[in-house]
UniProtKB/Swiss-Prot annotation:
This protein's record includes keyword Cell inner membrane: yes
TM helices/strands, residue ranges: 17-37
Subunit organization: Type II secretion system is composed of four main components: the outer membrane complex, the inner membrane complex, the cytoplasmic secretion ATPase and the periplasm-spanning pseudopilus. Forms homodimers. Interacts with OutL/GspL. Interacts with OutE/GspE and OutF/GspF.
Protein name according to UniProt: Type II secretion system protein M
Ranges in the topological domain labelled Cytoplasmic: 1-16
Function: Inner membrane component of the type II secretion system required for the energy-dependent secretion of extracellular factors such as proteases and toxins from the periplasm. Plays a role in the complex assembly and recruits OutL resulting in a stable complex in the inner membrane. Provides thus a link between the energy-providing OutE protein in the cytoplasm and the rest of the T2SS machinery.
Keyword Protein transport assigned: yes
Origin organism lineage: Bacteria, Pseudomonadati, Pseudomonadota, Gammaproteobacteria, Enterobacterales
GO CC terms of this entry: plasma membrane; type II protein secretion system complex
Originating gene: outM
């Protein structure tokens, strides 16, 4: 420490001023790179996260009501589904064979034969849009070595007015 003090005293006024300026610059750089820049980066990341979450909320609000949790009020209550309600005729149009239908309270449990996955999705969409029948649950298994063909072992449907 004495060596530093001796060197400081040997320096001219101009050299001392330059050393102080350089020291101040080093301190400012350290503050910027060790504190300010990481803090700004974390703020930017949080802002991006908040914006992504806002976009997700907007997307969820724009989705059709079938993706929202149903509320049983205001005349929108589950009703028993008849065989016609499931749209057996529309199933045939889409090449879907209904093997078994079993009523369960306000739902109907349906077992289907192997069918084309895209046709199944179109059929379920038509049931919802035209008949007010929503899918409560579905178990789908891909058929090995048959691209696009699935086996539906359980399909629970419910009609909502």
């Amino acid at each position: 420490m004495n060596e530093l003090r001796r060197r400081w005293q040997v320096m001219s006024q101009r050299e001392r001023l330059m050393a102080l300026a350089c020291g101040g610059l080093v301190v400012l750089c350290l503050l910027y790179y060790l504190i300010w820049a990481p803090w700004q980066e974390s703020v930017r990341q949080w802002q991006m996260t908040v914006e992504r979450e806002r976009q997700t909320v907007r997307w969820m609000q724009q989705q059709p009501p079938r993706f929202r949790r149903r509320k049983v009020r205001g005349g929108r209550x589950p009703v028993a589904i008849s065989a016609n309600g499931i749209g057996a005729q529309s199933a045939v149009r889409y090449g879907i064979t209904v093997l078994r239908m079993q009523p369960q309270e306000s739902q109907v449990s349906v077992t289907l034969a192997r069918s084309d996955f895209n046709n199944l999705l179109h059929w379920l969409a038509e049931l919802e849009q035209k008949n007010g029948v929503i899918t409560q649950g579905i178990d789908v298994t891909a058929v090995p070595n048959s691209p696009g063909i699935v086996e539906v072992t359980r399909l629970s449907l419910e009609r909502v007015l």
